[in-house]
Amino acid sequence: MALVPVVVEQTSRGERSYDIFSRLLKERIIFLGDEINDVTASLLVAQLLFLEAEDPDKDIQIYINSPGGSITAGMAIYDTMNYIKPDVSTICVGMAASMGAFLLAAGAKGKRFALPNAEVMIHQPLGGTRGQAEDIRIHAERIVKLRDTLNKILVERTGQPLERVQKDTDRDFFMEAKEAKEYGIIDEVISSRK
């Protein structure tokens, strides 16, 4: 069981306690600090929709420290980030790998950041299937189509030519924060709010 810190606030009605993530949500901050799967995607999508309903004109920040995960779950988050009215700023703390890196790049242009010692890793989709030959062929075609879709979006988000994105995502491609900026995945490396 994960330990979640509690924050206590004084209000006119007494003390109020929040888990740290609920308190951050009040400040329009979402933390993606786990593998991306259907559960984390549902929670993140719900938080994005809630914050849009609260104030459709105020930016939302997503802090990312994720090894990546499910493509379909990640695309649910990506589509929602683009669907809602507020700009979504993304900040990499630690590591944004695979779908985590994709979501980092999906932030609003000019509002994608990484801390100085953060790392970013992109690669092609991973897949594995068992079964009859025809089923394996169907899954292989699907994963190639997903790879092409992800690469096309990375081209749009980074400004890199398709050939470079295809080459770089063929295997694990690691970048330090400054390299992720040069690549176009983020817009700035930030070290302080001062």
Curated annotation (Swiss-Prot):
It holds the Pfam family CLP_protease. It comes from the Bacteria. It catalyses: Hydrolysis of proteins to small peptides in the presence of ATP and magnesium. alpha-casein is the usual test substrate. In the absence of ATP, only oligopeptides shorter than five residues are hydrolyzed (such as succinyl-Leu-Tyr-|-NHMec, and Leu-Tyr-Leu-|-Tyr-Trp, in which cleavage of the -Tyr-|-Leu- and -Tyr-|-Trp bonds also occurs). Cleaves peptides in various proteins in a process that requires ATP hydrolysis. Has a chymotrypsin-like activity. Plays a major role in the degradation of misfolded proteins. Its EC number is 3.4.21.92. InterPro entries: ClpP, ClpP/crotonase-like_dom_sf, ClpP/TepA, ClpP_His_AS, ClpP_Ser_AS. PROSITE patterns: CLP_PROTEASE_HIS (PS00382), CLP_PROTEASE_SER (PS00381). Fourteen ClpP subunits assemble into 2 heptameric rings which stack back to back to give a disk-like structure with a central cavity, resembling the structure of eukaryotic proteasomes. One of its GO terms (biological process) is protein quality control for misfolded or incompletely synthesized proteins. Its main location: cytoplasm. One of its GO terms (cellular component) is cytoplasm. It comes from Alkaliphilus metalliredigens (strain QYMF). The keyword Protease applies. NCBIfam families: clpP, PRK00277.1, PRK12553.1. The active site is at S98 (nucleophile), H123. It is found in: Cytoplasm. Gene3D superfamilies: 2-enoyl-CoA Hydratase, Chain A, domain 1. This is ATP-dependent Clp protease proteolytic subunit. Keywords: Cytoplasm, Hydrolase, Protease, Serine protease. GO terms for molecular function: ATP-dependent peptidase activity; ATPase binding; serine-type endopeptidase activity.
